[in-house]
Amino acid sequence: MLNSPVLSIITVSAFDEIRLSKTMNSLARVSKNVEYIVVIPENDLGSKNIWEKFKKDFNSTTKIIHDKNIGVYEAMNLGVSQATGEYVCFWNSGDELISSDSLDILIEALQSAAPLWLICQGDFTWHKPLILDNSELKGFVLHEPAKFISHQTVIARKSFFDNLNGFNTRFKVAADTAQIILMSQITMPYFANIQVVRVETPNFASHYQRRSRSEIVLISLLYLRGTKRVKAFHNIVKAELIFLYNKFTRKRI
């Protein structure tokens, strides 16, 4: 496609107008090499109004996609199917650019290195950031929440993502981690020492309409109560991460 964007940034949101407006305001007037896609439930009129409000400020292409209250990872796959950028990445509602030239620097790195996938640096105000190097992929250490790779810092070539059939939606909470592991088994990422995204504190309750994250809402509401249901959900998360960790370490050469 002629004049197609270099990067498509995809935000999957649900009834989270305040945070969505924060992200859209951050990305308005960025490079024309960036496409911004918002995926929301078809009955989320508040988020649609936010998109309508900010779209006029965009120098780049922006589009909105309505889904039928599907799960968050299904919605992320839907966003990729409509993306026209050479590369894709995923930001949550509330995430922001660290600086006005962050994306320009990132795009220069993508164009010069032409990687299958890239990991940049992010600003995490709610935990210690993970420092990466090119010698080994780190971040799959259980029970150490500071050691992980956030999907907001991962940029993948769209054709690479498509060839892997997108996110594996069998996972309720760890499909993004599964995707990172799968990509790392094929080829190691290019590490770019570029601060791009300020990652907002997770707001799991904003996804209450999405079935694949329905259990997470329980955590956000009952986390301090120590209920058996919360502990059961913790076991789901732990089981998924242990499965991925074991699969990763067994196949690692």
Model-assigned labels for residue ranges:
Residues 33-45, 65-66:
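Short beta-strand/loop segment that forms part of the nucleotide-sugar
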Residues 10, 132-216:
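Conserved nucleotide-sugar donor-binding catalytic segment
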Residues 5-8, 35, 178:
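Cell-envelope/extracellular polymer assembly enzymes that use nucleotide-activated donors
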Residues 67-83:
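Glycine-rich, basic loop-to-helix element that forms the pyrophosphate-binding segment
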Residues 25-34:
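Short, acidic, metal-binding catalytic loop of nucleotide-sugar glycosyltransferases
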Residues 88:
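Short aromatic/hydrophobic "clamp" motif used to bind/position activated sugar donors
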Residues 100-131:
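Conserved donor NDP-sugar-binding/catalytic core segment of glycosyltransferases
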Residues 40-51, 92:
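A conserved acidic beta->alpha catalytic loop
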